[in-house]
Regions:
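Conserved loop->alpha-helix
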Residues: 1-243
């Protein structure tokens, strides 16, 4: 679990195919279509990172392999490659260590399970900040709300506005100077794609409602909820019948 607060900008230094992995001293990788990635920590403190720990790389949760003071390796499956961008080529990446129970939740709950990618449709200066416009896949649009939270390339951000036009959903996000300075967003261009994870809580609520509706239990479940709310001792006000 993560919180969407980037701790350092690392770098993907190299990649190995399955045939190269089999001859590598680190543990062999079983996914013939996946990759093993060599990651450099950058300014991230690796003193508390051990083999098998989780780390978010551009918002995607990866398992640390063979960590050193300079970096580590991680394996990325074909499924992850299909759902993400920025993990299959050398370049700078956002890094965040897994959240401890005692840590501050500075952003929002981020699972590190990327849902898909969003396309940059605009990037412009707004006083001292920058406005980032993203086109969200239609399959994820229902989970994105105004003033809700999203993880974009591993960064916890607040959605300022949601626009639905001609079957496309575009969201507007404000990047404050601190975020602009501490991330790789300043390197973006229109047309680039970024990893997107919607709020896990929104996804879970939608899944429960979908299950209730598909099973035909939706009216009954709602009735039980209101019955519980109107029971003695409930603090939830329930409107009585009209005359």
């Amino acid at each position: 679990m993560f919180t969407g607060i980037v701790q350092a900008i690392g770098r993907i230094e190299g990649l190995m195919s399955q045939s190269q992995v089999l001859s590598h001293p680190a543990s062999p990788y079983s996914d013939a279509q996946g990759l093993r990635v060599h990651l450099l920590w950058g300014d991230l403190d690796p003193s508390d990172i051990a083999e098998g720990d989780s780390i978010a790389v551009n918002g995607a949760c990866m398992t640390v392999i063979a960590p050193t003071d300079q970096g580590c390796f991680f394996d990325i499956s074909r499924e992850s490659l299909n759902r993400t961008v920025g993990l299959d080529k050398p370049g700078p990446v956002h890094l965040e260590k897994a959240l401890r129970a005692s840590d501050r939740l500075g952003g929002h709950i981020v699972s590190g399970h990327v849902d898909g990618t969003a396309r940059v449709t605009g990037l412009r200066s707004r006083d001292e900040s920058h406005e980032l416009l993203l086109e969200v896949p239609s399959s994820l649009a229902m989970f994105v709300t105004e003033k809700g939270s999203v993880s974009v390339h591993g960064v916890s951000l607040t959605v300022n506005a949601v626009s639905d036009l001609n079957g496309q959903t575009e969201i507007s996000i404000n990047l404050i100077p601190h975020t602009w300075k501490k991330t790789i967003f300043s390197q973006l261009a229109v047309g680039d794609r970024l990893n997107l994870e919607v709020d896990p809580l929104a996804r879970q609520v939608a899944r429960v409602l979908e299950s209730l509706i598909n099973s035909g239990r939706w009216p009954t479940a709602v009735g039980h909820a209101f019955a519980s709310a109107s029971a003695p001792g409930s603090d939830l006000p329930v409107q009585g019948p009209r005359a």
